[in-house]
């Protein structure tokens, strides 16, 4: 069985619970092939780097994918005993056939300032009172979808069932059911919700990398504001997206155009 870890921006200690989960799986399945989809890397506590690297180095077949050059070089330096790849974010693997359904659904004049509200937001870069912009965060983070709650309940049930020896068959069934639910219900729902969110806008300013990526895929004018770890600029620089402008150097131009 090949084990796949989701990509994103949670490798390191910014979201430590995600990293701890990865480490537990890596330790529990030392002989299974494991592939981590493209990640951005960030450590506040540098003492954790060697500890994490030691756990991963003991695995027999672990591939770590980075989605920007800074993260790739970091992994090559500190996690060099594993196979390291530089790969675009998984959102770029959404099919053109799927994206084409949304590319024409634009309401001209509607503009989005996608402003994250979590610990990755650099509050020194906040733009207030943008004229004509909707100020939103990612919809599934503003309001947790019911399907994610159901999936969490199913996974929690499977976790507790595994502790009861006589119910291991039921535990496997619930776990398989949860996996099918995630693949057939949750994933399509979250993808559709993200596309429904971004596609109507004719212009986007974003503090989230996936807001940037979806805007690119939908061929929209987009500016970005870096998060606290610099992952947006790292991604833009890595994949030579020089026509995508960072707000900070152009803030006067943006404000002159859009702020009351």
Where do the model's predicted regions map?
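Active-site anion-handling motifs in enzyme catalytic cores
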Residues: 1-260
């Amino acid at each position: 069985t090949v084990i796949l870890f989701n990509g994103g921006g949670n490798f390191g200690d910014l979201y430590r619970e995600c990293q701890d989960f990865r480490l537990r799986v890596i330790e529990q399945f030392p002989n299974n092939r494991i592939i981590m989809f493209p990640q951005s890397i960030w450590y506040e506590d540098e003492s954790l780097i060697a500890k994490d690297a030691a756990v991963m180095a003991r695995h027999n077949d672990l591939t770590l994918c980075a989605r920007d050059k800074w993260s790739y070089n970091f992994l090559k330096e500190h996690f060099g005993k594993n196979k390291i790849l530089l790969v675009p974010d998984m959102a770029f693997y959404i099919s053109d056939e799927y994206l084409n359904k949304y590319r024409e659904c634009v309401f001209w004049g509607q503009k989005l300032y996608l402003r994250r509200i979590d610990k990755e937001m650099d509050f020194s870069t906040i733009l207030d009172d943008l004229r004509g912009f909707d100020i939103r965060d990612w919809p599934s983070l503003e309001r947790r979808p019911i399907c994610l709650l159901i999936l969490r309940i199913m996974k929690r049930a499977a976790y507790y069932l595994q502790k009861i020896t006589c119910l291991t068959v039921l535990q496997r069934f619930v776990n398989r059911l949860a996996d099918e639910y995630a693949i057939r219900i949750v994933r399509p729902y979250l993808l559709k919700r993200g596309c429904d969110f971004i596609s109507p806008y004719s212009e986007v300013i974003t503090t989230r990398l996936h807001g940037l990526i979806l805007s690119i895929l939908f061929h929209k004018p987009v500016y970005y504001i870096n998060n606290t770890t610099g992952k947006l600029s790292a991604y833009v620089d890595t994949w030579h997206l020089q026509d995508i402008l960072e707000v900070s150097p152009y803030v006067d131009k943006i404000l002159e155009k859009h702020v009351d």
